[in-house]
Amino acid sequence: WATKLTMAVNVSARQFREADFIGRIESLIARVGIDAFSLELELTESVLVDDLEATLEKMAQLRRHGVRFALDDFGTGYSSLAYLKRLPIDVLKIDRSFTMDIDAPEHSGQGKRPAVLIDAIVAMAHQLDLRVLAEGVETLAQQERLLRSGCDLFQGYRFSRPLPEAEFRAWAAAQQ
């Protein structure tokens, strides 16, 4: 499984706008010795708001090195479908605010809305050849419902809490 491991890194709008951002990523790839295809930069919609053309150019430069991109927290911000049409992203990350109520009973006040929205997001993303990651998965029931919706990947406390490096290494070794 380690050969399939992807290192996903959150990137803030401020970091992404820095003039030397591309050089820093290239240097990091060389210094650490990872395959650039194993690096996935997670960008929130706020990164895109200021200057879409400059964002697209930076993404294209990094993509030429093999870096992949995820659109993080989809559905919580400026969510323009025009972004999905233009951005060279690989993964759409559905925000936990959608997934946390996916297994709520229909009489809970939420009704079918969370599931219907997730079904629609997943269907749209798959039509755009994007993988879909559901954030905030905490229970088996949520995971099973998200699987039925077609989610490809999952993140949340059901699998692990965030770990310091040493604990991650021990966890990873135990998975082999």
Residues covered by each model-derived region:
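Phosphate-binding/switch loop-helix module in NTP-utilizing enzymes
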Residues: 61
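A short helix/loop element that forms part of the nucleotide-sugar donor recognition site in Leloir-type
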Residues: 22-26
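EAL-family c-di-GMP phosphodiesterase catalytic domain
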Residues: 10-19, 38-53, 65-176
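Conserved functional hotspot residues or short segments at active or partner-binding sites
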Residues: 58
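Helix C-cap/alpha-to-beta connector motif
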Residues: 1-11, 27-38, 65
